[in-house]
Amino acid sequence: MTTISKNKTSNSKGKTTTLGTILKPLNSKYGKVLPGWGTAGIMLIFMTLFAIFLTIILEIYNSSVILDIK
């Protein structure tokens, strides 16, 4: 037996978290275009960190040393 809800709106506001509070300023700028490079610098940093992470995983998988730092 199925239950049909007549009220389609939700009354709960949701949970407020620390991470949500920290990220809220980023969401408030949604849809706006930043002048110049915008957030390309942040994206470059995260892409570089991700590439380093993948290199470390590849080193572990191959049991070799790609970056020999001495």
Curated annotation (Swiss-Prot):
<dbReference type="GO" id="GO:0015979">
    <property type="term" value="P:photosynthesis"/>
</dbReference>
<comment type="subunit">
    <text>PSII is composed of 1 copy each of membrane proteins PsbA, PsbB, PsbC, PsbD, PsbE, PsbF, PsbH, PsbI, PsbJ, PsbK, PsbL, PsbM, PsbT, PsbY, PsbZ, Psb30/Ycf12, at least 3 peripheral proteins of the oxygen-evolving complex and a large number of cofactors. It forms dimeric complexes.</text>
</comment>
<comment type="function">
    <text>One of the components of the core complex of photosystem II (PSII), required for its stability and/or assembly. PSII is a light-driven water:plastoquinone oxidoreductase that uses light energy to abstract electrons from H(2)O, generating O(2) and a proton gradient subsequently used for ATP formation. It consists of a core antenna complex that captures photons, and an electron transfer chain that converts photonic excitation into a charge separation.</text>
</comment>
<dbReference type="GO" id="GO:0050821">
    <property type="term" value="P:protein stabilization"/>
</dbReference>
<keyword id="KW-0602">Photosynthesis</keyword>
<dbReference type="GO" id="GO:0009523">
    <property type="term" value="C:photosystem II"/>
</dbReference>
<feature type="transmembrane region" description="Helical">
    <location>
        <begin position="40"/>
        <end position="60"/>
    </location>
</feature>
<dbReference type="Pfam" id="PF00737">
    <property type="entry name" value="PsbH"/>
</dbReference>
<dbReference type="InterPro" id="IPR036863">
    <property type="entry name" value="PSII_PsbH_sf"/>
</dbReference>
<dbReference type="GO" id="GO:0009535">
    <property type="term" value="C:chloroplast thylakoid membrane"/>
</dbReference>
<dbReference type="InterPro" id="IPR001056">
    <property type="entry name" value="PSII_PsbH"/>
</dbReference>
<keyword id="KW-0812">Transmembrane</keyword>
<keyword id="KW-0150">Chloroplast</keyword>
<keyword id="KW-0472">Membrane</keyword>
<protein>
    <recommendedName>
        <fullName>Photosystem II reaction center protein H</fullName>
    </recommendedName>
</protein>
<keyword id="KW-0604">Photosystem II</keyword>
<comment type="similarity">
    <text>Belongs to the PsbH family.</text>
</comment>
<dbReference type="GO" id="GO:0042301">
    <property type="term" value="F:phosphate ion binding"/>
</dbReference>
<keyword id="KW-0793">Thylakoid</keyword>
<keyword id="KW-0934">Plastid</keyword>
<keyword id="KW-1133">Transmembrane helix</keyword>
